[in-house]
Amino acid sequence: MAPFWIALQFLTILPIELKTIPTAQQNGRAILFYPLVGLIIGGILFLVTCIFVKLPALLLAAIVFALWIWLTGGLHLDGLADTADAWVGGFGDKLRTLQIMKDPSCGPIGVLSIVIVCLLKFALIYVLIEQHQSLFLICIPILGRVVPSILFLTTPYVREKGLGRSLTDHLPKTASWIITGFVLLLPLYWEWQGLIAIISFLISLVYLRHVFIKRIGGITGDTVGAAIEIGETVLIFTFVVSYFYLV
């Protein structure tokens, strides 16, 4: 179960103490448990909506969204900001783009990207709660945590070192494809809404993958984080929009 605890420690701020430093093989296997960590995150969010169901929807949405960011430590938002800064500041140059991604400071474009994504997510969570569709909150983080598997399975990793290299080199491919396929079927519980949402989600990932390859020749940890945030936002957005047009 070491890979599960590695995944839980990496993807959340939960106080998990590992007895030893994870090996490259353990890091690679840990990615298989990312969707399970997403289930834990989504389950907590849904549980909060059930416990505080009597609160005004706007306040409850703020609580849920703040809790979501807190549970993940803003990990993927950091990747989104770094990617946005690098894409604008890199001026189309691969080496400059990769160099900017390594800069720990956050520029104005990075801040703007976080603000836009957070505003959209907050508004969409509010609509889910108001329309009694909070159950979908469980599904969102699960789908978001399958993004790394999809990208690492299909896209070159451009850096020679780092966690991403371990994940790429030691990811169990067959098991990862099976888990990914199962996770992608989950939104079908919501029938046409879920189908439209998952198709839009996959289209967004295909597009982002194309953009990443065109600019830097593949992916980095930051671009994977950005893809998670953008993919989740697209997933909720299309689910909410289809709810009003199909129900």
From Swiss-Prot:
Q: Which Gene Ontology molecular function entries are recorded, alphabetically? A: adenosylcobinamide-GDP ribazoletransferase activity; cobalamin 5'-phosphate synthase activity
Q: NCBIfam families, per this entry?
A: cobS, PRK00235.1-5
The protein's organism comes out as Acinetobacter baumannii (strain ACICU)
A GO biological-process term: cobalamin biosynthetic process
**What keyword terms does UniProt attach to this protein?**
Cell inner membrane, Cell membrane, Cobalamin biosynthesis, Magnesium, Membrane, Transferase, Transmembrane, Transmembrane helix
Q: Name one GO cellular component term.
A: plasma membrane
Q: Which InterPro entries match?
A: CobS
Its domain of life? Bacteria
Cofactor dependence is on:
Mg(2+)
UniProt membrane topology term: Multi-pass membrane protein
User: What is the designated name of this protein?
Assistant: Adenosylcobinamide-GDP ribazoletransferase
Which reaction is the catalytic activity of this chain?
Answer: alpha-ribazole + adenosylcob(III)inamide-GDP = adenosylcob(III)alamin + GMP + H(+); alpha-ribazole 5'-phosphate + adenosylcob(III)inamide-GDP = adenosylcob(III)alamin 5'-phosphate + GMP + H(+)
The subcellular localization recorded is: Cell inner membrane
Q: Where's it mainly located?
A: membrane
Q: Which family does it belong to?
A: Belongs to the CobS family.
Key word Cytoplasm present: no
List the pathway annotation: Cofactor biosynthesis; adenosylcobalamin biosynthesis; adenosylcobalamin from cob(II)yrinate a,c-diamide: step 7/7
Q: Which HAMAP family match?
A: CobS
The job of this chain, per UniProt, is described as:
Joins adenosylcobinamide-GDP and alpha-ribazole to generate adenosylcobalamin (Ado-cobalamin). Also synthesizes adenosylcobalamin 5'-phosphate from adenosylcobinamide-GDP and alpha-ribazole 5'-phosphate.
Identify the EC number(s).
Answer: 2.7.8.26
Give the gene name.
cobS
Q: What sections of the protein cross the membrane?
A: 31-51, 55-75, 109-129, 135-155, 183-203, 227-247
